[in-house]
């Protein structure tokens, strides 16, 4: 009977699991492909069959979380853009913000290990600046929404620096939450209060 093939999906999954442990223990910089292969019981050749390099492997470890987060943000951003383009800038449905936040919180805690890898163990990898890239993505969207609302309320456009700071505040809220709160239900309560705070600040700037 032929021996088990090393180039199968089970081997890939096992490598990802072992890599996750190695990255959690040592961070991206300290982790070694040799150590990961030893834990997985495979050769480095088997690892390179699935992954180009250590960065590719790290991205694979955190990939599911990042894909889900991007999809939630894409759906929420699309909803808000449709609101603005349909002349409902003054009628924004705040409940959509709370729904999106609940989805984000659930994903952050479903993949909390992976989230913490990106936030605290990613130095030296292509994921190192992911929080900054999320701020940039949020910033572009917020600038569009803010301009539409300011026009609807006939008030001057909020300064770009302020919009950028608000974008940082939104991302920083989640970073603080996931790095300081262990329980998902407690995190959701925190996030809901955070959204109330952020919405109050937003409307305080654009409503006359």
Predicted regions: what is each one?
Residues 84-88, 102-125, 176:
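Amphipathic alpha-helical segments used for helix-helix packing
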Residues 61-97:
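Amphipathic alpha-helical linker/stalk segments
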């Amino acid at each position: 009977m032929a021996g088990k093939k090393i180039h199968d999906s089970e081997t890939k999954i096992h490598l990802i699991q072992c890599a996750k442990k190695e990255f959690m223990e040592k961070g991206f910089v300290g982790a070694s492909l040799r150590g990961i292969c030893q834990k997985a019981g495979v050769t480095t050749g088997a690892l390179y069959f699935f992954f180009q390099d250590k960065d590719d492997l790290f991205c694979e470890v955190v990939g599911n979380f990042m894909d889900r987060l991007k999809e939630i943000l894409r759906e929420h951003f699309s909803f808000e853009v449709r609101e603005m383009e349909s002349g409902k800038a003054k009628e924004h449905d705040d409940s959509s913000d709370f729904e999106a936040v609940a989805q984000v919180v659930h994903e952050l805690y479903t993949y909390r290990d992976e989230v913490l890898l990106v936030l605290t163990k990613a130095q030296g990898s292509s994921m190192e600046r992911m929080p900054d890239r999320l701020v940039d993505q949020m910033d572009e969207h917020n600038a569009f929404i803010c301009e539409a609302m300011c026009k609807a309320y006939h008030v001057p456009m909020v300064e770009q620096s302020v919009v950028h700071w608000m974008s940082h505040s939104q991302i920083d809220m989640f970073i603080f939450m996931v790095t300081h709160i262990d329980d998902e239900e407690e995190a959701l309560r925190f996030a809901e209060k955070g959204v109330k705070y952020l919405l109050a600040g937003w409307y305080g700037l654009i409503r006359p």
